C-alpha cells in the first residue's frame, strides 16, 4: 500500500508532554480486532479522549480546538509497551504525519516508518523548547525536512538534525512501502536472477 510522499512538512503541532506513553494508551487492546488499517484514528488515545459514556473529556489535548496540526509532539519513551502496529495505524489514521519525541520505543518507531509516519527523535533540550514554544503560542509551527533530516522551530529558527535509516528515508520520500519498493526495482531483480548460474 503506497502512502503520501514525505518531503518537507510544515505544520503546527499537538503537544502531549507525557512520558512513557505506551501502545495500550495509544490504542486500547479492545479495538485491535479489525484487520484493515482504516478507522483506528477514531480510537486514538481512546481512554484519554472519552469518558465511560463516550462523551469527550474536554481537558484532553485532542479535544481542545486550540491545538491542531499534522505533527504530534510526545514525551520521552513514546510508543513503549507491547508490539502492536495498530498503534501506528491509529496515529496515521487520525491525521498525524510525524511524531516528535526525545526517545521512541524501537518497535513503534519501526511500525511508524512502515506506514508513512515519520518518527523524529530530538534531544531532550530541543523537545523542551518545542513544548515551551507551543505553550506560549499554540499556532507555533515546526518544519520537518526529510531530505535534509532536520527539524526547525520556526518561531526561533532553531534547528536540529535527526537520524533515519536510509532505506526507510528513501521509501518515505517516494511514498513507498516495502512491496512498492520491490515492485519499483522489479527489472533489476529479474536481471540479477537471470544471471545466476542455477
Residue positions per predicted region:
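Cytosolic catalytic domains that perform sulfur/thiol-centered chemistry
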Residues: 1-198
Amino acid at each position: 500500500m503506497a502512502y503520501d510522499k514525505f518531503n518537507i512538512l510544515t505544520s503546527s503541532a499537538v503537544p502531549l508532554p507525557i512520558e512513557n506513553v505506551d501502545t495500550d494508551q495509544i490504542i486500547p487492546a479492545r479495538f485491535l480486532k479489525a484487520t484493515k488499517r482504516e478507522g483506528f484514528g477514531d480510537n486514538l488515545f481512546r481512554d484519554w479522549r472519552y469518558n465511560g459514556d463516550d462523551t469527550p473529556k474536554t481537558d484532553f489535548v485532542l479535544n481542545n480546538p486550540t491545538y491542531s496540526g499534522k505533527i504530534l509532539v510526545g514525551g520521552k519513551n513514546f510508543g513503549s509497551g507491547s508490539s502492536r502496529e495498530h498503534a501506528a495505524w491509529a496515529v496515521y489514521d487520525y491525521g498525524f504525519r510525524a511524531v516528535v519525541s526525545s526517545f521512541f520505543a524501537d518497535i513503534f518507531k519501526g511500525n511508524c516508518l512502515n506506514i508513512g509516519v515519520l518518527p523524529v527523535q530530538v534531544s531532550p533540550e530541543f523537545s523542551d523548547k518545542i513544548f515551551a514554544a507551543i505553550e506560549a503560542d499554540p499556532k507555533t509551527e515546526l518544519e520537518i525536512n526529510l531530505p535534509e533530516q532536520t527539524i526547525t522551530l520556526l518561531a526561533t529558527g532553531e534547528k536540529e538534525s535527526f537520524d533515519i535509516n536510509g532505506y526507510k528515508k528513501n521509501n518515505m520520500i517516494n511514498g513507498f512501502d516495502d512491496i512498492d519498493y520491490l515492485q519499483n526495482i522489479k527489472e533489476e531483480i529479474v536481471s540479477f536472477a537471470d544471471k545466476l548460474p542455477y
